[in-house]
């Protein structure tokens, strides 16, 4: 039996990051089983925004919506965890950028019973835009 992996992404507006997340996860060397977007009251309609990507997507995508009554990151993550069907949950923010072997590295670390944690690498908006341009060139 294969372990199921769920990625839970907190989201608020800036829906282009949701598209980038789906595209990046489709390029992973280890595929996930489920992607859950926990939307903290975005004004735009997420599923309409990503509908063209759903056709060829190899993993299930869920959208969990909660009303925007202020920044509630912990509640968003808890709501995503409640909806998850995976054996292993990976929590990400909407604007994270990662390598194509990111999921595989986390999965392999888990199999070796290592502690798994993540640390943010802060970058300027200019650096982030350059990175995003490079990513978009691949797709």
List where the protein language model places each region:
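Short alpha-helix within the catalytic core of nucleotide-sugar-dependent glycosyltransferases
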Residues: 22-23, 47, 86, 100-111
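Short, well-formed alpha-helical segments that are part of the catalytic scaffolds
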Residues: 14-27
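A conserved acidic beta->alpha catalytic loop
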Residues: 39-50, 96
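Cell-envelope/extracellular polymer assembly enzymes that use nucleotide-activated donors
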Residues: 4-6, 34
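Glycine-rich, basic loop-to-helix element that forms the pyrophosphate-binding segment
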Residues: 67-84
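Short aromatic/hydrophobic "clamp" motif used to bind/position activated sugar donors
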Residues: 89
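Conserved donor NDP-sugar-binding/catalytic core segment of glycosyltransferases
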Residues: 101-139
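Short beta-strand/loop segment that forms part of the nucleotide-sugar
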Residues: 33-42, 64-66
């Amino acid at each position: 039996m294969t372990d199921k992996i769920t990625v839970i992404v907190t989201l608020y507006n800036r829906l282009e990051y949701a598209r980038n997340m789906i595209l990046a996860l489709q390029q992973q060397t280890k595929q996930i089983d489920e992607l859950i977007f926990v939307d903290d009251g975005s004004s735009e309609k997420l599923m309409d925004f990503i509908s063209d990507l759903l056709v060829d997507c190899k993993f299930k995508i869920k959208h969990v919506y909660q009303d925007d009554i202020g920044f509630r990151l912990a509640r968003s993550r808890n709501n995503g965890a409640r909806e998850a069907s995976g054996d292993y949950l990976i929590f990400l923010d909407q604007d994270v950028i990662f390598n194509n072997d990111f999921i595989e590295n986390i999965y392999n670390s888990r199999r070796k019973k290592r502690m798994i944690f993540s640390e943010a690498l802060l970058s300027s908006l200019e650096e982030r835009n350059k990175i995003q341009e490079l990513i978009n060139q691949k797709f």
